[in-house]
């Protein structure tokens, strides 16, 4: 079975406690129309985040979410 995209994984954090950087990242990512939604590639995703970082779409939150994403069974 193919692993779901990082985008679909992060969407599971939407609607949570706004004090959580993962939640803020998920909400911001959802509204980014050019986000690489099908990607499972770290370099493609991190390059996008580095290029389009915002107050909520941070590389720190991305790194934490990527660790969680990679840790999935």
UniProtKB/Swiss-Prot annotation:
SUPFAM superfamilies with a match to the protein in the record: YozE-like
Annotated signal sequence range: none
InterPro entries associated with the record: UPF0346, YozE_SAM-like, YozE_SAM-like_sf
Pfam families, per the entry: YozE_SAM_like
Similarity section: Belongs to the UPF0346 family.
Record-given protein name: UPF0346 protein Bsph_2735
């Amino acid at each position: 079975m193919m692993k779901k995209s990082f985008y679909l994984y992060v969407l599971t954090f939407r609607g949570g406690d706004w004090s959580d950087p993962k939640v803020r990242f998920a909400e911001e990512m959802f509204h980014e129309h050019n986000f690489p939604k099908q990607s499972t590639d770290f370099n493609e995703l991190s390059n996008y985040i580095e290029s389009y970082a915002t107050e909520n779409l941070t590389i720190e939150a991305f790194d934490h979410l990527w660790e969680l994403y990679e840790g999935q069974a």
